[in-house]
UniProtKB/Swiss-Prot annotation:
It is found in: Cytoplasm; Nucleus. This is Putative uncharacterized hydrolase C7D4.05. It comes from Schizosaccharomyces pombe (strain 972 / ATCC 24843). Belongs to the HAD-like hydrolase superfamily. Keywords: Cytoplasm, Hydrolase, Nucleus.
Length: 228
């Protein structure tokens, strides 16, 4: 059952990260290629794209949740993905540079409405704001680089929580954090999640009686907060 949305009752608003509030400034294969050239590593864009997609898929299956299940930390997990994205061995410094690139705001564009929305909410204190993302702490460093990490109240990263969307546990984690911040109980229908994956974001949240709407980097998500 999908709850009827009454925006006046919403207390917790959560966003997905990648594809929703953050978008890659350049495609991954292009970034990899540009950095590789600096280190004399030669590979075509097609080779890098094929290898990086395969590496990400393989490591996601063998070492789930960015290595959480295997005892790997996210840094080492990503370094392995980067190393397997090229047909020849790569210098350690090159892999570290690529890791660092995607840990800063230069690697991303941010949703054009997000910063003003967060600043206004901080002043008005309408909602508890959270991020629910199948990722690790690195996303917080990106938001720190944008200077907005303090405008977000709750960070629910799958690596830290131990569960990935669409599992309800990661949504429950965010709601429990909101309860502690507010000092009062929150009902599922008082929560809203925005994300760009119809299964892992929208359906997953609605299945546990949250409000949920589709949102990507181009979506005017402010319309979801207009009282009908």
């Amino acid at each position: 059952m999908i709850p009827s949305k009454n925006i006046q009752k919403i207390k917790l608003v959560t966003f997905d990260a990648f594809g929703t509030i953050l978008h890659l400034s350049k495609p991954v294969p292009i970034v990899y290629s540009e950095v590789a050239q600096k280190y004399g590593v030669h590979a075509t864009i097609d080779e890098i794209e094929h290898n990086s997609n395969k590496a990400f898929k393989d490591f996601s299956e063998k070492h789930k949740n960015h290595g959480k299940k295997s005892g790997l930390n996210p840094h080492d997990w990503w370094i392995k993905v980067i190393e397997h994205s090229f047909p020849t061995p790569v210098p350690a410094e090159m892999a570290e540079e690529l890791w660092s690139y995607f840990s800063k705001k230069t690697g991303y564009t941010i949703h054009p409405l997000l910063i003003d929305f967060l600043k206004r909410n901080k002043e008005e204190r309408k909602y508890i704001i959270g991020i629910i993302s199948n990722t690790d702490e690195r996303i917080r460093t990106v938001l720190e680089d944008y200077g907005i990490d303090h405008l977000i109240d709750i960070y629910a990263f799958s690596y830290d929580v131990g569960f990935e969307k669409p599992s309800r546990e990661i949504f429950d984690y965010a709601m429990e954090k909101a309860v502690k911040l507010l000092g009062q109980e929150i009902q599922p229908e008082e929560c809203m999640h925005l994300g760009d994956d119809l299964i892992k974001d929208v359906s997953a949240a609605r299945n546990i009686q949250w409000n949920a709407e589709y949102c990507d980097i181009k979506t005017n998500f402010l319309k979801y907060f207009e009282q009908k």
